[in-house]
Amino acid sequence: MEEKVAAIIAALRERYPDALCALHYGKDYELMIAVRLSAQCTDARVNLVTPALFARYPTLDAFAEADVAEVEGYVHSCGFYKHKAEDIVLACRMLRDEYGGKVPGTMEQLLRLPGVGRKTANLLLGDIYGTPGSVVCDTHCIRICNLLGLASGKDPAKVEQQLRAILPPEESSDFCHRLVLHGRAVCAARKPACDRCCLAPYCKSFTGE
C-alpha cells in the first residue's frame, strides 16, 4: 500500500503542481466564510458571490456586527442562505470576542465555531497553518479514494481516519486539494475520462480489479 500511495501522490503532483484551494480570499476569516458558503454549492458560484460580500463587509468587525438579513441577500444564490448567513455572522463574532480576531489553529477550537465541521476545520488548518495530517474529505476525495482502493465507504469521518493512516502527514492537505482538481477536470462522477487519467493504473474502475 505504501508504494501505491507514493505513486498516486507523485502522479497527482506531476499533473497538478499547484495544489491550491479554488476559493478566492484575501484574509484568513474570509476563507472560513467562503468554505461555509461552498457547502452544497460550487466553488465557482462562491467566487462570484464573495467579491461583493467582502467589499460590503471589509473587516471582521463589520461581519460580526452585520445584519443577518442583509448578509442573506448577498449569499442567497449559494443556497441554504439563511443558515449560512447566520453562521457567518455568529462565527465572525466568536472570532472577534473569543479568539482575538484570528481563526484558531486547533481542531477543538475550530469546531466550536458555528457552521464549522471537520471538513472545514481540516481545510483551514491545512491552508492557513500548514498543519500536517489535515485531511479534507469532500465528495471528490471520498469517491476517488474509494475507486483507488485507498478508502472504503462514504462516511467522511471514517474516510478521513482511513486516509490519515496511510497518507504522509506532510502530503495530506495537498493530496486532498489535488483530488478535488482531478475530480473536476478528469474523474467526473457521471462521465469519467479514464482514457486521460493519470491515476488509471491504480483505479478499480479502469483495471476491473
Segments from the language model and where they lie:
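Catalytic cores of DNA base-excision repair glycosylases
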Residues: 2-209
